Amino acid sequence: MTSSRKVRPTKHIFVTGGVVSSLGKGLTAASLGQLLIARGLSVTMQKLDPYLNVDPGTMNPFEHGEVFVTEDGAETDLDLGHYERFLDRNLGLNANVTTGKVYSTVIAKERRGEYLGKTVQVIPHITDEIKARILSMGEPDAHGNAPDVVISEVGGTVGDIESQPFLEAARQVRHEIGRENCFFIHCSLVPYLATSGELKTKPTQHSVAELRGIGILPDALVLRCDREVPQGLKDKIAMMCDVDYEGVVSCPDSSSIYNIPDVLYREHLDTFIIRRLGLPFRDVDWSTWHDLLERVNNPRHELTVGIVGKYIDLPDAYLSVVEAVRAAGYANWTRTNIKWITSDDCETPSGAMKALSGLDAIVVPGGFGIRGIEGKIGAITFAREHKIPLLGLCLGLQCTVIEAARQAGLEQASSTEFDPAATQPVIATMEEQKAAVSGEADLGGTMRLGAYPATLEEGSLVAELYGTTEVSERHRHRYEVNNAYRAQIAEGSDLVFSGTSPDGHLVEFVEYPKEVHPYLVATQAHPEYKSRPTHAHPLFYGLVKTALELRVHP
């Protein structure tokens, strides 16, 4: 059956950045996507990353931040999390393109002889591969529907050597599909000098000059600053950078990232783009988003949620966890203040008491390696004994099981990840992961990745939270609960194994009954990846809701 939608060319919007990194290109792109969706357009997004890694899966969290996992099991840049949350749609493997992926594909083609003996070069072979991946995002889906708009964020900063092939590919895309079907947005810093009390435009002028030097004239500029950029300076930048006055947009720092679409709307960026690209549109329907902003900016309650992690020196390592906690807060009209707690501080009862006292709820997120594990277990013990609501994620479930096993008399309970010679390995390496763990197979892209189904026990707390006994969550792990110890742990502690894989083999959820603890739930999955600011994830929602109830009825 063919689609009834009118056939029109997909429009491509490229978002670049200049002057400095971490300007918020991803948030700008995601906010624009949300704004265009509110205009009735279908939008998809893509991140072009210039690093040589095939994906960020093997990168240090301190170096890269969070690895965001998609439904189809791709390990991707954290910006894809922003895209999914703002667009409220799932993205896949093709939404993250890295230099490593591109070169791997091109070299594999060369080895197969697909270039017919030609000298393989950055131009045209690398740029052609990048172009193909960009244009593929605009192809029709299984139902014959193509997106109206593809927004591609080019990682890095204009002027970086690594970014040049991607920028050249974007330039060629504009040439091939027509200027009327392509739009370039450049994000730039407008610094404020306190000594002179002035905003400086020169960095932006030089950044645009650098971009023009490689053949790209931006259609719009998003000016990042710690304050509003006055109209006079915007007009000056428009003149000096040869950009339409309407295309120069001020985007000052905001108290919440979810205010950014409204900022861009008030600057009329969407109107300018729609007119330039000849897109159909309707009046903005922001009923859902404005309800979110009301909850973000006018909360009725306030809670403090502790995140007990190993990588807290770089909060971006837990970006989706933080946003999932905040989304649960919004759903409960609550401002959730995040307190970062290094797991090492919770190794002793006195350390846990000092670090965790006064918290309304605790999240124990994922991680790898032995450092800080006893602290995570100590935090779980403290939460269990003091009836503090706690949610464990991935490694958080494994630590919850180890803590329960020690209650059940398995005093040496541990994981083969931390101690390959453990005498009571209540957490063990998954059979299909043993080659990777032993070094006989690649580490990259070989974990249990992506969405997997689970069956929940009828009448369990997790089944009540989800409202069903059949669920699907995203995963990223190599280790699992050792089934040889399940019965002993269940008999010797109050822990309930409340959800498993459909075949009953893999433990996916554990919990304590409500009469034992108000809310101590853990999952082998990463539910934070499926949370949306407008649709809080059930497990995070339950955590915040229980914490609020305990505030009222301790």
From Swiss-Prot:
Short name of one Pfam family: CTP_synth_N
Pathway stated in the Swiss-Prot or TrEMBL entry: Pyrimidine metabolism; CTP biosynthesis via de novo pathway; CTP from UDP: step 2/2
Positions of UTP binding: S21, K200, T201, K202, P203, T204, Q205, K236
Domain of life: Bacteria
InterPro entries from the UniProt entry: Class_I_gatase-like, CTP_synthase, CTP_synthase_N, GATASE, GATase1_CTP_Synthase, P-loop_NTPase
Residues annotated as binding Mg(2+): D79, E153
One record GO biological process: 'de novo' CTP biosynthetic process
Reaction(s) catalysed (UniProt annotation): UTP + L-glutamine + ATP + H2O = CTP + L-glutamate + ADP + phosphate + 2 H(+); L-glutamine + H2O = L-glutamate + NH4(+); UTP + NH4(+) + ATP = CTP + ADP + phosphate + 2 H(+)
Residues noted as binding CTP in the record, renumbered to the chain: S21, D160, I161, E162, K200, T201, K202, P203, T204, Q205, K236
Enzyme class: ligase
Position of the signal peptide: none
GO cellular component: cytosol
Molecular function in Gene Ontology: ATP binding; CTP synthase activity; glutaminase activity; identical protein binding; metal ion binding
Binding-site positions, ATP: S22, L23, G24, K25, G26, L27, D79
Gene3D superfamilies assigned to the protein according to its UniProt record, in alphabetical order: 3.40.50.880, P-loop containing nucleotide triphosphate hydrolases
PANTHER family (alphabetical): CTP SYNTHASE, CTP SYNTHASE-RELATED
Other information: CTPSs have evolved a hybrid strategy for distinguishing between UTP and CTP. The overlapping regions of the product feedback inhibitory and substrate sites recognize a common feature in both compounds, the triphosphate moiety. To differentiate isosteric substrate and product pyrimidine rings, an additional pocket far from the expected kinase/ligase catalytic site, specifically recognizes the cytosine and ribose portions of the product inhibitor.
Function: Catalyzes the ATP-dependent amination of UTP to CTP with either L-glutamine or ammonia as the source of nitrogen. Regulates intracellular CTP levels through interactions with the four ribonucleotide triphosphates.
Name assigned to this protein: CTP synthase
Species: Corynebacterium glutamicum (strain ATCC 13032 / DSM 20300 / JCM 1318 / BCRC 11384 / CCUG 27702 / LMG 3730 / NBRC 12168 / NCIMB 10025 / NRRL B-2784 / 534)
Lineage, broadest ranks: Bacteria, Bacillati, Actinomycetota, Actinomycetes, Mycobacteriales
